[in-house]
């Protein structure tokens, strides 16, 4: 099949999905995510054993994260259950084949959560990673926070979110976010070699173990009162002047003036 915003190439038992949304810096807009999800669905075939997600070679930006133009104005949850980011992270996590994120360039905001939802992350040494919701006044949701803390740990996630500052690939490797960091000229060969190696293993066993790991990773307890309390806190944020100020400042390309209400 052909797609507008991604390109798909199969190499033996490995499928490579390359982003093709450069004019928007591979932002996670609905049209892009719809194409990506359709490509994954089409690749859920027995002869495909492993998937690689990548930006085009030489990319300065792997993905800019959320498409800010698609975030709702005040009064609506910017990260609801059917948000494109929520949809693609669920699909990656539940997909029955290993998915490797091959990262070249900078990873911003929601795209960081997306790659964290994949099974392995292999990055070029020049890559950087940042979580930026506080630059926009966006109240990240519980599922997204859980996805991040499950793999990166609370203190690292707090630093990433509270500062919104990028970290290097070397530091991301040191704190356990990445599996491997290689020089950019070696990235494609290294990742393909890993994917081909995985593709020769028992696919049914891999599928069930991936699902077991997902279920174990999501095993947590929160009572309904706590959930409603957190949702109320989030609602106060996306109803706030700060949320609207963050959106306006981004679109107007200026520094936001957050006042705390």
Swiss-Prot record:
It catalyses: (R)-methylmalonyl-CoA + H(+) = propanoyl-CoA + CO2. Keywords: Lyase. PROSITE patterns: ENOYL_COA_HYDRATASE. Gene3D superfamilies: 2-enoyl-CoA Hydratase, Chain A, domain 1 (3.90.226.10), Lyase 2-enoyl-coa Hydratase, Chain A, domain 2 (1.10.12.10). Substrate binds at residues 64-68, 110, 132, 253. One of its GO terms (biological process) is fatty acid beta-oxidation. One of its GO terms (molecular function) is carboxy-lyase activity. GO terms for cellular component: cytosol. Dimer of homotrimers. PANTHER family: ENOYL-COA HYDRATASE, MITOCHONDRIAL, ENOYL-COA HYDRATASE-RELATED. This is Methylmalonyl-CoA decarboxylase.
